[in-house]
Swiss-Prot record:
Spans annotated as Disordered: 309-344
A GO biological process held by the record: regulation of translation
Taxonomic classification: Eukaryota, Viridiplantae, Streptophyta, Embryophyta, Tracheophyta
Keywords, sorted A to Z: Cytoplasm, Initiation factor, Phosphoprotein, Protein biosynthesis, Translation regulation
Post-translational changes noted in the entry: Phosphorylated at Ser-56 by GCN2. Phosphorylated at Ser-317 and Ser-322 by CK2.
Single annotated GO MF: translation initiation factor activity
Description of how the protein assembles with itself and partners: Eukaryotic translation initiation factor 2 eIF2 is a heterotrimeric complex composed of an alpha, a beta and a gamma subunit.
Name by which UniProt lists this protein: Eukaryotic translation initiation factor 2 subunit alpha
CDD domains on file: S1_IF2_alpha
Similarity comment text for this entry: Belongs to the eIF-2-alpha family.
Primary site of residence: cytoplasm
Described function: Functions in the early steps of protein synthesis by forming a ternary complex with GTP and initiator tRNA. This complex binds to a 40S ribosomal subunit, followed by mRNA binding to form a 43S pre-initiation complex. Junction of the 60S ribosomal subunit to form the 80S initiation complex is preceded by hydrolysis of the GTP bound to eIF-2 and release of an eIF-2-GDP binary complex. In order for eIF-2 to recycle and catalyze another round of initiation, the GDP bound to eIF-2 must exchange with GTP by way of a reaction catalyzed by eIF2B.
Record GO cellular component, one term: cytosol
Length: 344
């Protein structure tokens, strides 16, 4: 007979109900005559109610403008009747600070819950059992299980090996005894580790600065090449610096790092090193856009810009005569790894 499927329904926190004056995340389910019925997302979707009088501090002109079915948002807990399971909530009493803190907590809890649920399903254990033995103890010890999971990424044993649970066994003499055993088996540890590292390993961000670099002196291109090398030499193992030509005289400096502030500081130092080197040969560096974190969209726009500039340069080169081609402006394309420093 096949094993029954594990129960994957469970609240996120040990307490079955939220505390009064606590901000919680809800989703609106239905709108009735007196108020809106909602699900408390962090408490296994138990039902709560927001009276229309608790929607806004101002005079209500349109209910639909204040609350809509399907909307997810933070609200404040007014009353909790644990015996009857009634929870009264307020939208008008939750402050901006409460909203921000609630959203941050909920986003962390949602990720933890997703990992817990996936592990429970993978190993075939009830989700609540996993929370009792692992999840909620981590909340108690670390303030939030999310913080514990961040440690698991690099040091899983320090988190999991400290967790224990009690089991009752009957000895040879028929007497029931309680034993303390590890809460996390090797199978569970492997499942957690795989899922946590996949979802929570921080991805390096890209930091970029845009500059103009010129040198009209004799061997100007070589001086630019040396200045670029000085800039790249500032890079470190966790903040390597690369400088790339967009189209003369435009260049971009980039680094990939887990530490945004350190990446910005490193690029600024690289720019300073480049300025010092190029000014020794009467060249000039102008910062067009300072060091900042960039997105994939920014990279796509840069690639499109580079392609357009290269195409424009090729068209201009085709229109110019051979005499113009021999002229050295000191701003030619630089191959920092090549011998001559000039891309033919």
């Amino acid at each position: 007979m096949a094993n029954p499927a594990p129960n994957l329904e469970c609240r996120m926190y040990e307490s079955r109900y939220p505390d009064v004056d606590m901000a919680v995340m809800i989703q609106v389910k239905t709108i009735a005559d007196m108020g809106a019925y909602v699900s408390l997302l962090e408490y296994n979707n138990i039902e709560g109610m927001i009276l229309f009088s608790e929607l806004s501090r101002r005079r209500i002109r349109s209910i639909s403008s204040l609350i809509k079915v399907g909307r997810t948002e933070p609200v404040m807990v007014l009353r909790v009747d644990r015996e009857r399971g009634y929870i009264d909530l307020s939208k008008r009493r939750v402050s901006d600070e409460d909203k921000e803190a609630c959203e941050e907590r909920y986003n962390k809890s949602k990720l933890v819950h997703s990992i817990m649920r996936h592990v429970a399903e993978t190993v075939g254990v009830d989700l609540e059992e996993l929370y009792v033995n692992i999840g909620w103890p981590l909340y108690k010890k670390h303030g939030h299980a999310f913080e514990a999971f961040k440690i698991v990424v690099t040091d899983p044993d320090s988190v999991f090996d400290a967790l224990t649970r009690e089991v009752k066994e009957t000895g040879p003499d028929g007497v029931e005894v309680t034993k303390v055993v590890p809460a996390v088996s090797e199978e569970l540890k492997d499942a957690f580790l795989k899922d946590i590292r996949r979802r929570m390993t921080p991805q390096p961000m890209k930091i970029r600065a845009d500059i103009e670099l010129k040198c009209f002196q004799f061997d100007g291109v070589l001086h630019i090449k040396e200045a670029m090398k000085k800039a790249e030499a500032v890079g470190t193992d966790d903040c390597p610096v690369k400088i790339k030509l967009v189209a003369p005289p435009l260049y971009v400096l980039t680094t990939h790092t887990h530490y945004k502030e350190k990446g910005i500081v490193t690029l600024n130092k690289a720019i300073e090193a480049c300025i010092t080197a190029i000014e020794e040969h009467k060249g000039k560096l102008v910062v067009k856009e300072g060091a900042r974190a960039v997105s994939e969209r920014d990279d796509k726009l840069l690639a499109e810009h580079m392609a357009k500039l290269r195409m424009d340069n090729e068209e201009m080169s085709g229109d110019e005569g051979s005499e113009d081609e021999e002229e050295d402006t000191g701003m030619g394309e630089v191959d920092i790894d090549g011998g001559s420093g000039i891309i033919e």
